Amino acid sequence: MILNDSTIMRMVSDGLLISENFDRGCLTPNGYDLRVDAIDVEGRQYSEFEIGKNVHFLVSTIEILKIPDDVVGMIWTRSSFARKGIFGSFGAIDAGYHGNLTLSFFNAGSAVNLRRGERIAQIVFVKMIGSAEKPYHIRSGNYQNSRGIVKDPVAGSQIASEAKKN
């Protein structure tokens, strides 16, 4: 079941789904528009950048998510960016995830100016039949509690900690 706007608002009020930097103006009937925080192009970070044609770039979100153990997030590039030739590749946001997101995009079109605060992707929250037996923070937690642009697993995550032991 996809969560509607009133359910999203109620859950956000309870400290779930989007725990920091929620903006009611980004709420949609069945989801939420995620906003650009930092832009990473070739390892350098910007708050505003003209993304050229055939350029891969990363974006961190302003929003900090707190996904409950019985919800999954699904993300799509906003159609206004897709029409300009910007495409993204995203996985599901696992039940139990907490942190901001680092999203990967590619510009196949003409140069596009991108700036902090711009709405670039939509997240839809889907209620699972029940809670995950092993939510993200227990199963792996590679990017749990991430902040900013994150390319590698967050130090201190369960898998990163176990890798150091071996």
Swiss-Prot record:
Which keywords does UniProt give here?
A: Hydrolase, Nucleotide metabolism, Nucleotide-binding
- Give the GO biological process terms: dUMP biosynthetic process; dUTP biosynthetic process
Note whether Hydrolase occurs among the keywords. yes
What the entry lists under SUPFAM superfamilies is as follows: dUTPase-like
Pathway(s): Pyrimidine metabolism; dUMP biosynthesis; dUMP from dCTP (dUTP route): step 1/2
Catalyzed reactions: dCTP + H2O + H(+) = dUTP + NH4(+)
Q: What class of enzyme is it?
A: hydrolase
Q: Which residues bind dCTP?
A: 78-83, 94, 122, 136
Query: GO molecular-function annotation terms?
Result: dCTP deaminase activity; nucleotide binding
Q: Which InterPro entries does the record cross-reference, listed alphabetically?
A: dCTP_deaminase (IPR011962), dUTPase-like_sf (IPR036157), dUTPase_trimeric (IPR033704)
Q: Which residue ranges run through the membrane?
A: none
Q: For this protein, what is the EC number?
A: 3.5.4.13
Q: Which HAMAP family match?
A: dCTP_deaminase (MF_00146)
| Function of the protein | Catalyzes the deamination of dCTP to dUTP.
Q: What's the family?
A: Belongs to the dCTP deaminase family.
Check the record and name the NCBIfam families matching this protein: dCTP_deam
What quaternary structure, including any partners, is listed in this protein's UniProt entry?
A: Homotrimer.
Q: What is this protein called?
A: dCTP deaminase
